[in-house]
């Protein structure tokens, strides 16, 4: 059991950077969970980390701060590619854990040193827009923060969370998962 289920930073990202991140999105595709099913019409777009190193440079220090200040102190070594998520009216994301069904799913990708033999340890959501209604991020049954553009939240990847239905406007967020060796 963790003492702090999340750690957040208000106005961590400038509105200019939020707009810049949204502009990185190419073609969106349907978002899936690890069981391969599509859960509503949420759109996601992968951001090429090789082309957008500045995103890692921006968010890595916040992740380190959250990991330390929340008291998790997880061994984190790398991160996945960033994903920009777009939610339209009626879109939502069902309750799930990012660490997959058993919370300890180890990546078996020998050709990728950043992912191979690692598990998701810390999840991140950056709020990129705020001109929408609904769409609250709920973590472990609670809504921990306001959805203002520029806000940033981290939580252990094994904690359940969901995005409530968007009732108007478009919700943009940026997600990533920080990885390390399997929990012992």
Locate each region found by the language model:
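Fe(II)/2-oxoglutarate oxygenase catalytic core
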Residues: 1-154, 158-184
